[in-house]
Amino acid sequence: MIQMQTTLDVADNTGARAVMCIKVLGGSKRRYAGIGDIIKVSVKDAAPRGRVKKGEIYNAVVVRTAKGVRRKDGSLIRFGGNAAVLLNAKLEPIGTRIFGPVTRELRTERFMKIVSLAPEVL
């Protein structure tokens, strides 16, 4: 469950280490984002020679949350922290590698690239 001011780890090789959610996209009164939702983020910590710089603003898709995701069979998949993958204006991943597991809920037409790059799909 991600809301404004939530800090997230970055699960790709763009050079960003930490980002902060500045807006949950998808409606004017929308408060929370879960796995598979698109948010607007600001880069708070970045590697020196990465693709992105501190202070830049990007779209991102949430790939892991500490709150987890409930499946139809009743099982719950939780993670140790919150993580996102940075996207460009066309909602394509900026990075070429994804670190850590992602969930099967990302297997929509929009995010198949992220699922194919991920080392593990839960």
Swiss-Prot record:
<keyword id="KW-0687">Ribonucleoprotein</keyword>
<dbReference type="Pfam" id="PF00238">
    <property type="entry name" value="Ribosomal_L14"/>
</dbReference>
<comment type="function">
    <text>Binds to 23S rRNA. Forms part of two intersubunit bridges in the 70S ribosome.</text>
</comment>
<comment type="similarity">
    <text>Belongs to the universal ribosomal protein uL14 family.</text>
</comment>
<dbReference type="GO" id="GO:0070180">
    <property type="term" value="F:large ribosomal subunit rRNA binding"/>
</dbReference>
<dbReference type="InterPro" id="IPR036853">
    <property type="entry name" value="Ribosomal_uL14_sf"/>
</dbReference>
<keyword id="KW-0699">rRNA-binding</keyword>
<dbReference type="InterPro" id="IPR019972">
    <property type="entry name" value="Ribosomal_uL14_CS"/>
</dbReference>
<dbReference type="GO" id="GO:0003735">
    <property type="term" value="F:structural constituent of ribosome"/>
</dbReference>
<comment type="subunit">
    <text>Part of the 50S ribosomal subunit. Forms a cluster with proteins L3 and L19. In the 70S ribosome, L14 and L19 interact and together make contacts with the 16S rRNA in bridges B5 and B8.</text>
</comment>
<keyword id="KW-0694">RNA-binding</keyword>
<dbReference type="GO" id="GO:0006412">
    <property type="term" value="P:translation"/>
</dbReference>
<protein>
    <recommendedName>
        <fullName>Large ribosomal subunit protein uL14</fullName>
    </recommendedName>
</protein>
<dbReference type="GO" id="GO:0022625">
    <property type="term" value="C:cytosolic large ribosomal subunit"/>
</dbReference>
<dbReference type="InterPro" id="IPR005745">
    <property type="entry name" value="Ribosomal_uL14_bac-type"/>
</dbReference>
<dbReference type="InterPro" id="IPR000218">
    <property type="entry name" value="Ribosomal_uL14"/>
</dbReference>
<keyword id="KW-0689">Ribosomal protein</keyword>
